[in-house]
């Protein structure tokens, strides 16, 4: 016979697995549709018209039209395509299900159109809303917070292809009764995360790791180098933190989302022309291309880091539906490669991983997630102790500093962004 504790944990196991699978399937369908549309917009259509896909005209035109299209969706869809991600944390309160269709359409358009945002925030919003709405009907005794936790865990597992990130994140957020062991509280979320990760793995494998030279042995000087790199990344990120609310307020004085996003798309197009195709989209595939291109110089990496960070701020300030983690990782990779080219004595494994740690820490203010992203992009067990040590001064630098979020106007309800 199972202990009552075990029976309690098993109660939510089946819903957790179902939510994890559903979270992954929603992500897969959205990404597949976005991929097909992206291929149409950036490969087939310019080829048919006899236009180079990397021509300045095409980049500016597609991003401007993408902004107008997303603005129309936000303006006229029911629920106005959900909350503005610039005003929301990664895991937020459930939104009305009526807003989800517009949110999904806005996300797909942004992903396909080359906007420098990832899918994580809108997908998280969709999955939480569906889990809460359906779960409340099927199991009304389970509170909304439980469904929110399961959906967010399943989504994190699906996004990163592993339940490890969910385990790290929720180990610091599940502050339930001290009488209940932590792993009892983690059981159902980890079931959801594992189901999400395994389902994603059946269709595709998220590829984060970069072909960077192996780091052999940690030296004391490497800790100092890593801390300096992380501090540089944090300084760059804090510039974006300062710019985001000010640019958001300035752009949203126009009130009309079609105009705001159209202008935002045009600015993104100009940035895309400056940075080239590698500076577009969410950044994961593009950072692989950046590392593979041996022709990039120190100034090229610096330019890509600045342009991608600027594009991230513009896209978020304009109200595009998307997340900030994936493009921030791209910025970290570009910044790390630039610093390695500038000071070759510091291994690229250190500069890239510590730059990712610093910039993701600014964006998420989550130490575990920052460590995870740095470790999966530069997978080297020798780096783990160094990253844990470098995290300490990085965390001190950010203590009490503003987050990369916009304070929502008091008169604006969470699901209305017109």
Curated annotation (Swiss-Prot):
InterPro entries: Chloride_channel_YfeO, Cl-channel_core, ClC, ClC-type_chloride_channel
Identification of the protein by name: Putative ion-transport protein YfeO
Compartment list: Cell membrane
Organism per entry: Escherichia coli O17:K52:H18 (strain UMN026 / ExPEC)
Record field: transmembrane: 10-30, 54-74, 99-119, 120-140, 149-169, 186-206, 223-243, 258-278, 300-320, 322-342, 343-363, 371-391
Any single Pfam family the record assigns to this protein: Voltage_CLC
HAMAP family per UniProt: CLC_YfeO
PANTHER family named among the record's database cross-references: CHLORIDE CHANNEL PROTEIN CLC-E (PTHR43427), ION-TRANSPORT PROTEIN YFEO-RELATED (PTHR43427:SF9)
Topological type in the membrane: Multi-pass membrane protein
Family: Belongs to the chloride channel (TC 2.A.49) family.
Example GO molecular function: monoatomic ion channel activity
CDD domains per record: Voltage_gated_ClC
Keyword Transport: yes
Domain of life according to the entry: Bacteria
Entry's Gene Ontology cellular component terms: plasma membrane
Keyword annotations from UniProtKB, A to Z: Cell membrane, Ion channel, Ion transport, Membrane, Transmembrane, Transmembrane helix, Transport
